Amino acid sequence: MHLLVLGANGLLGSNAVQAGLEKGWTVSGTYHSTAPDFDIPLFELDIIDSSTTSEIIEAVDPDWVVNCAAMTDVDGCEEHPDRAHDVNAQAPGEIAAYCNQAECEFLHVSTDYVFDGKSTASYSENDSVNPVQVYGQSKLDGERAVQEVMPEALVTRLSFVYGVHRGTDELAGFPKWVRDQLVADNEVPLFTDQHITPSRAGHTASTLLELIEAGASGTYNVACRSCVSPYEFGAAICDRMGAAKSLLEDGSQSDIERPATRPAHTCLDVTKTEDKLGRRQPTLTADLEAISGWFDSEPKPNDR
């Protein structure tokens, strides 16, 4: 199996590279500006550069292209909607078309923010979509662009990605911020009126490759089984660190002004993924246990 990971220097992309290498697959990757520290063929690429993208796919001749490249800054997308559309919507459709021409398969990574968050139940792949900000709309447009030219493509929706960056071996995302605040003895304001199903990058990347091996196509939710608020997520990190929860402060999304609206409840139902793979997705507690070494003063590099 030959995998081409677009966005190999991102959190998810670096884990996809690592997961592929651990399976003994041939892996190539692209990066936007800074090359990751992997001993694989790497190509500098801005995915809105359609001609270069096409040339790389033709040169690499992969079995699968995995698109982890995206504009994920939610507020940045709101402030720069044209760039968000180019990266998150137009480019994925073009990549899918190139994959058709090259006769390779395509996995596109999307988001829980395609939903409006008005439901109190976890969203399945078949629930109605209704993004409430530019980021979610651009990602939904990307899903549709991909599926229009390649109906058999694999589209995966993730939620609140965090974990260990495999190019730098450093903790990244929400847990890093909470950990650093707790270590500095700072108060940590966390929302209680937002609910998500966090996606640990390491397990998520492995799940994406399992779906590839299982011959999956269509849309799949890939997240943990725990629907939690950021406050509850922070409390779980405190438990993992053995830190006092007294530093955590109840907060509301209305407490701060941001350019983009965030949906209140975008927990993902992962039943379809579990049924396809014949196993359960992890809980948040299990996912944090898997990277417990990065909450210590001296990380354990072999933790996954």
Report the location of each language-model feature:
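N-terminal Rossmann NAD(P)H-binding glycine-rich loop of SDR-like oxidoreductase domains
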Residues: 1-23
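NAD(P)H-binding glycine-rich loop region in Rossmannoid oxidoreductase-like domains
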Residues: 44-87
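Glycine-rich NAD(P)-binding loop of the Rossmann-fold in SDR/ketoreductase-type enzymes
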Residues: 48, 79, 83-94, 129, ...
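Conserved Rossmann-fold NAD(P)-dependent oxidoreductase catalytic core, especially the SDR/UDP-sugar
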Residues: 90-134
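Active-site Tyr-X1-5-Lys
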Residues: 130-154
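NAD(P)-dependent short-chain dehydrogenase/reductase
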Residues: 147-195, 203
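Mid/C-terminal beta-alpha module of Rossmann-like enzyme folds, strongest
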Residues: 184, 191, 207-208, 214-259, ...
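Amphipathic terminal alpha-helices
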Residues: 284-304
